[in-house]
């Protein structure tokens, strides 16, 4: 569960390393974001050769959370970090590679490109 001012690692090669959540999208009173939700973020740390720079405001989809997510069969999946993938307006990732595992719930929310680029889907 992520909210405003939460810091996330970036799990792609778009150039950003760390981002800060400035808004959870999906409703006027929506407070928390979980896996598969879209958030507006600002880049706090970036590599000098990347396509996004420090201070850029972009959209991202949450791919891993420490809080985890509960599945229909009763199992819970949790990750070691909070991570997001920066996306373009057409909901495709801005980078060309995804680092680390992602949750299966992204497939249900139609982020097929992220699922196909990920090295492992849990």
UniProtKB/Swiss-Prot annotation:
Keywords attached to this entry: Ribonucleoprotein, Ribosomal protein, RNA-binding, rRNA-binding
PROSITE patterns: RIBOSOMAL_L14
GO CC list: cytosolic large ribosomal subunit
A GO biological-process term: translation
InterPro entries, alphabetized: Ribosomal_uL14, Ribosomal_uL14_bac-type, Ribosomal_uL14_CS, Ribosomal_uL14_sf
GO MF: large ribosomal subunit rRNA binding; structural constituent of ribosome
Annotated family: Belongs to the universal ribosomal protein uL14 family.
Function: Binds to 23S rRNA. Forms part of two intersubunit bridges in the 70S ribosome.
Subunit composition and interactions: Part of the 50S ribosomal subunit. Forms a cluster with proteins L3 and L19. In the 70S ribosome, L14 and L19 interact and together make contacts with the 16S rRNA in bridges B5 and B8.
Identification of the protein by name: Large ribosomal subunit protein uL14
Source species: Acholeplasma laidlawii (strain PG-8A)
